[in-house]
Amino acid sequence: MACTTLLVGKNASYDGSTMIARNDDSGSGHFTAKKFVVVQPEEHPAVYRSVLSHVEIPLPGDPMRMTAMPNAVEGKGIWAAAGVNAANVGMTATETITSNPRVLGADPLVVYQPARGERPEVPGGIGEEDIVYLVLPYIHTARESVERLGKLLETYGTYEMNGIAFQDVNEIWWLETIGGHHWMARRVPDDSYVVMPNQLGIDAFDLDDAFGAQENHLCSADLREFIAKYHLDLAQDGVFDPRAAFGSHTDSDHVYNTPRAWYMLRTLNPTTWVWDGPDADYTPASDDLPWCMVPEKKITPEDVKYVLSSHYQGTPYDPYASYGARENRGVYRSIGINRNDFVALIQLRPDLPADLQAVEWVAYASNALNAMVPFYANVETTPAYLAGTTGEVSTDSFYWVSRMIAAMADASYGKSVFHVERYELGVLSACRALLNQYDAKQLAETDPARRAALRQEANEALAAEVKARAADTLDKVLFELSSNMKNAYSRSDM
């Protein structure tokens, strides 16, 4: 998927949480309806079969409950996308990334080949459709997640290049696939955040650690030999550069990928480097933008949402701008675009008991014109307003209401944007208050069953809050757009 990812280490966050967040975007020319659900252990089969690649994989016999953000319309696979399991391990997958012909020629992608004549079909590898479903129900730590996915990649291969994030309450790991069967993973420094557009991102990798203590680096068992055999190390100074070895540096990256990383870094570290002008240290076309940085201030969920909603506001590249050269507006691919299906931010809060730690923040449709809502993840069901999405447009669905608000507000941006700003502020403030209230109620309750019931009650209250505010905002932006119709006429009989 054409996505954008932001990871926040525990010492870089405002409250010591690990946070992983990703915009899940549809490809150009279509939209994918999504829903927020809980998948129970009994819903997992003994053998998984991919819809797209037809690969069959036996599953362990002890799956855990997990949340997921699957496709609302069946037929093309599950695409679970993001979630938290009962062990408080979070995962988001995948960020589609890039590679180069040297890698893809040395370790080709494992692509499904349909039957032809007397030749039987050849199953493909695993991909975004499958990865969360194959990994999340069976893992107890972020590191264990990397190890499980790594074994699956080595065994079955993949038909696409992907980046995947894993977290527990203590740490975050980021894994990138390399060709059909290889991979590398790096632990996110606790004091840093990571920005990821659709491009291989890891900018430094310690092979000695990966094949030694494995404190901060893990990789496929033969990666060192693979690099040497196919002459992938391009460094002149003896310091291995994984981007040069495994990644891409194309003209399209400078329009589609590097500008997004530039804006995220520029927002969270505005004075660390010079980001604009002829003397800029980094520009939207820079290939050496850092994979991770220590932020200038602690990062909140609201900061994450702002960054993942970017349309280059405050720069000449904002498609909504009324200033600057017209030819610069919209020249780069925005982070908050029309094709955002959802954003999921998974927050694991270390200062609370285990059953309260996991909060999953969810928003649907274009991030530039929506609102994000927190929900407890350690629950048995999710509210119908988020879980009941279908392929039919409905105001009873948070997904569809969000799509309508975004489309109408975009078409009447000058008059509607302040309605959306008030909507987002109101939702975040009210839902923060509800979360604080229900945290306190649970901390005062010693009965685990009662605490679980309070989480269910809280999620219904949060959904009711956003449903009312979304309906009010839809009414307002509909009025603004209707008032600006081309057949509008000022004279009336009333």
Predicted features and spans:
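Glycine-rich, aromatic-lined ligand/substrate-binding cores of catalytic
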Residues: 225-351
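Short, charged, surface-exposed loops that flank catalytic or proteolytic processing sites
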Residues: 138-144
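Short, well-structured alpha-helical segments that form the helix of a local strand-helix-strand
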Residues: 145-154, 304-308
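Substrate-recognition/cap regions that form aromatic- and gly/pro-loop-enriched pockets
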Residues: 313, 317-446
